[in-house]
Amino acid sequence: MFNKVEIQTDSLIAISYSENGSTPVCVAEIGKIEEPNRYYFHRLFVRKKYRNKGWATKLMEEILEKCDEKGIEILLEINPYTDDIDYQRLEDFYKRFGFEKVDYYYVRKPKN
């Protein structure tokens, strides 16, 4: 059984799932930046043994739904934090959700 924890404040949206209330299986977190209605995607992490099982997609869909409801634009930089995650695979993943490259970062505008 997986437990969901969700935190929403004026400056943060975070969602995580853990198995039986223990160590998180996956985490997604975005935080507000100086510009109105813009947030920065701080983290999308899925533990290795849970990868390729739809967790990253689930988190993205949930985070993006909240952003669309609030009219939030998201900025992110692609940084594979481990050697076993390919940059191109991450880029393709984010593009699937509507992120577009602008300079060195990616932007996703809300769907209204």
Give the role of each language-model region.
Residues 4-27:
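Conserved beta-hairpin
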Residues 12-14, 39, 106:
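Hydrophobic residues embedded in beta-strands of well-ordered beta-sheets
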Residues 19-37, 44:
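A conserved beta-strand-loop-helix scaffold within acyl/acetyltransferase catalytic domains
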Residues 36-48, 75-77:
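Conserved acetyl-CoA binding element of GNAT-fold acetyltransferases
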Residues 46, 52-65:
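Conserved acetyl-CoA-binding loop-helix of GNAT-fold acetyltransferases
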Residues 67-83:
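Conserved GNAT acetyl-CoA-binding A-motif
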Residues 83-93, 105-112:
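Short glycine/proline-centered loop/turn elements that form peptide/ligand docking sites
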Residues 93-94, 99:
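Conserved active-site tyrosine of GNAT-family acetyltransferases
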